[in-house]
Structures are given as structure tokens and as C-alpha cells.
Amino acid sequence: MAVKNIVAVDLGASSGRVMLATFHTATQHLTLKEIHRFSNTLVFQDNHHQWDLVALERDILTGLQQIDAMGIAPDSIGVDSWGVDYVLLDKNGQRVGLPYSYRDHRTDGVMAAVTAELGREAIYQHTGIQFLPFNTLYQLKALCDAPPDDLDKVEHLLMIPDYFHYRLTGNLVCEYTNASTTQLLNLEKKTWDGELLDYLGVPRRWLSDPVQPGHAVGNWTAPSGRQIPVTAVATHDTASAVVGAPLQSRDSAYLSSGTWSLMGIESDTPFNSPQALAANITNEGGVDDTYRVLKNIMGLWLLQRVCQERDIKDLGTLIQSATTLPAFVSLINPNDDRFINPPSMHQAIRDYCREHGQPVPQSDAELARCIFDSLALLYRQVVLELGELRHAPIRQLHIVGGGSQNAFLNQLCADVCQIPVLAGPVEASTLGNIGCQLMALGAVTDLAAFRHMLTHNFPLHRYTPRAESDFAGHWRRFQALSQPETAPQGKKETTQ
């Protein structure tokens, strides 16, 4: 019986993992084994928030070397990560400059200046990408407007997963789904937008033409001497998460729930109408020539920060305490600028509630309840916006990722959105990464077959909406808070 061993390196904005999948082609049985899990934390150095790429590479190699020591020769390796962030290389392939994080404040005010100069409508018609102040477009504008002394040494720009593929193989490849997050890819041509690059002053030699998921990057030489193929998967973690979401129909929306919440639909065509622009909808690249028509939501970053600041270790107890409190007492707009990276998240939430004349949450449980209620209401808003764009209602929501383990938030989402919710699998990004590799190897015929296989290997949990008698008033309150929408400052992830 043919067996495929696949390695997925899944890098998130707060953690990473090296996972080994074993797929039996005859029985369609897929198992996952976690080889190495590690943290990914921002480093504040030289007055900027940066990624510790050296530590990430060390952890990636630790996982791969452990697999090699087990005597396993994987059929393929693939890396996915968050979007928008990049690495600059010189002609010798050495890093140039700092590996900035999207949460760094160097882009503050840049998006406003660029859109004032070029016009939101023109940028959106070119790219179809939502306006987020940390998009690569604005990161590069900040870089080129205040160029470091060594900028003239730059020969190549790689997105984060492309950089690690390069470190494994020595080959420079730019993958499409992550490239689409930059707001520099032409929506129609699916290649770099020359006008935007010229505006920034970015030489075109920095950027190679994007390749589609499934592209063979090269080989990694393992300590044993084995040559292991490396495949460009859907390298944006959300793109992989969508592959790993067993959507049941085109009337289903997905919600990749983690540090960021990313909600959207799969579409054969992009949506870049004035209505889509007004809703700040993005059209990121997907697999099989699809578009991920979606919206970024601040997500569980809010809760993660509160737990960190308040030294909360027992998340289960916190959630249980929140369930006992009255609903919708204090509400925030999770996508308000102030929540991207405040000095104190719990204080930012309290200040917001105070400024809007609401009860100020004091206890940890009250803060959590405020976050959960507000996220569910924002999910409802995006579900309605997506339905209006496609001229057909969303009939089911599929939640994947780490946040899909939060049964309370899942049920709250079903209740507020008034549609059934399916939750799982948890490791959707990892599974989507694996799916891209299996399809590239011909072990799975297509995306539909892969998703069908997932439903037989990973249990899904269904949440049926319940009626809320006094919901209309809470919904009006939230709409007042969220209009006009303020886009989140500063990802990312999730992510984005």
C-alpha cells in the first residue's frame, strides 16, 4: 500500500510547528504527528518590532532533523506563514536590513498619505486588496521614503515562507497566495503591478514572477544526505487554512479563527466593486485559480493580550466564568485602530467602553465576555456584507483553526449570525499545507477530493443557532460603534 510522508511547517504570528503527515493512498487515511512546536515572539530591537528569523530557522531545522533521525524520507516539505512581511537579500543571498514585523509602528500614517496621493479607488481597482496600514505596499513606502544606507545592496525581496524555502533549497521562488497579500499584485494579471512599483521606487528586479501552489522549489539536503523535495504550498497561512476547511457548498463561508479572524468565501471571480471597496473586502489569491474574498478581523489577539497582561493561565476557567455573565453589556469594535498593539489591551478596552458611555468591564471574565460578544457581532456584520456582495445569503459558517476549539464562541457565533456553524479541524493551516503537497504529488486528485477526505479523518462539531429575544437592540448598538468602519492598524497574523 502506497504511503506518502508529508512535512508541513506552519508558522503563525505567535507560534510555529513542524508536523508530519502520513497518508495511505488506498484507504485515504491521514494522520498527523506533531514533531516540534515552538514560540514565535516579536523582538524589540533598534527601536523596531522585528521577527527573530534566526530562531525560527533554527526551530524549523530542529523539526526537520528530528524527522530525518527517525529514518523517514519525506516525499515533500512545505512552509506557510502569515502574510505581508518580507525579507530583503543582497546579490549573495544575505539578508539586508531588519526583518520588520507588520506590528511595527514605522507605517503609522503611511497608508493615509499614499491613498491621499493615489486614491483608494485607483489602488483598489489595480489590486482588489483591502486597506490595512501594515500591507507591504505601505511597509515599502516607509522603507523607500527613509532608505537605510544599505538599501542599494538589495537584489531580491522574498515573503517570509519564500525566505525559508530559499534557506532550505538555495532557490528564489515567490508564491502567489502570499504575494497577493502585499497590495502590490495586479488583480487581473496576477503579477506585480508595475505602476505601483514605480510609484514606490522599488526596482522590478527585487520581485520574481509569482508561481502557483504546487510548484517544485528544489531539494533540502538532510543530515543523512537524503534529498527531500520542497514544494511551494499555498504559503499564506490563511490560504492553506481555506484549503483545509471542508466547505460543503458555495453558500458556506469560512472563518479562520486564531490571532486574527479571517472570514470570507471562495469565488471564481474577484469582487472589486465600489460596494466591496466600501466594505474593505479583500481579494487574496487561492488555489485552483480561486479568490479568497474575505475580511480581516482583529480576532483572538485581543484575548491573548489580556491573558498575557493579566497573567491568566487557565483559559478554560476564564471562558467558563464569562459564560455566566449577562450578554452584550459592554461592546467594542474589535477592528478599531487602538487595538492593534496598545501598551495595555485591557486598559484600551476599558477606555473604549468608557468613551462610548458603556459599563466598563473590570474583572477578567467581564473583559473576556466583552471580547467574545463583540467578535460575534462583528462576525455577523461580515456575514451580512458577504451575502450582499454575492447577492445570495451565507447559509453556513465553517470555523477552522485554534479558535474553533472555543465552544462558547462557536455557539455565540451561531446564535448571533443565525446560521449553522461547523467547527474544525483545528490544524486547518497545517492540513491545507499538506493538501497542496498531496495534490502536487498526485496522491489526491483535486481540492474537492481532499476536503472530502478531511471530513472522514477529522470530526466536525455542529452548532445550531438559538433565538435571542432582545437581540435587535444589541445589534443596533454594535452597528453604531462600527460605523464608519476603522480598519485595523499596524497584522497578522494572524493572521493576516
UniProtKB/Swiss-Prot annotation:
Family of the protein in this entry: Belongs to the rhamnulokinase family.
Names of required cofactors: Mg(2+)
Protein encoded by which gene: rhaB
This protein's UniProt keywords: ATP-binding, Disulfide bond, Kinase, Magnesium, Nucleotide-binding, Rhamnose metabolism, Transferase
PANTHER family: L-RHAMNULOKINASE (PTHR10196:SF93), SUGAR KINASE (PTHR10196)
GO cellular component, one term: cytosol
Pathway info: Carbohydrate degradation; L-rhamnose degradation; glycerone phosphate from L-rhamnose: step 2/3
MF terms in GO: ATP binding; glycerol kinase activity; rhamnulokinase activity
Pfam families: FGGY_C, FGGY_N
Cystines in this chain: C353-C370, C413-C417
Residues the entry annotates as binding substrate: G83, H236, D237, T238, N296
Annotated signal sequence range: none
UniProt GO BP: glycerol metabolic process; rhamnose catabolic process
Record organism: Pectobacterium atrosepticum (strain SCRI 1043 / ATCC BAA-672) (Erwinia carotovora subsp. atroseptica)
EC number: 2.7.1.5
Binding site for ATP: A13, S14, S15, G16, R17, T259, Q304, G402
Catalytic residues as annotated in Swiss-Prot or TrEMBL: D237
Domain of life: Bacteria
EC main group: transferase
Protein name: Rhamnulokinase
Keyword Membrane: no
Task performed by this protein: Involved in the catabolism of L-rhamnose (6-deoxy-L-mannose). Catalyzes the transfer of the gamma-phosphate group from ATP to the 1-hydroxyl group of L-rhamnulose to yield L-rhamnulose 1-phosphate.
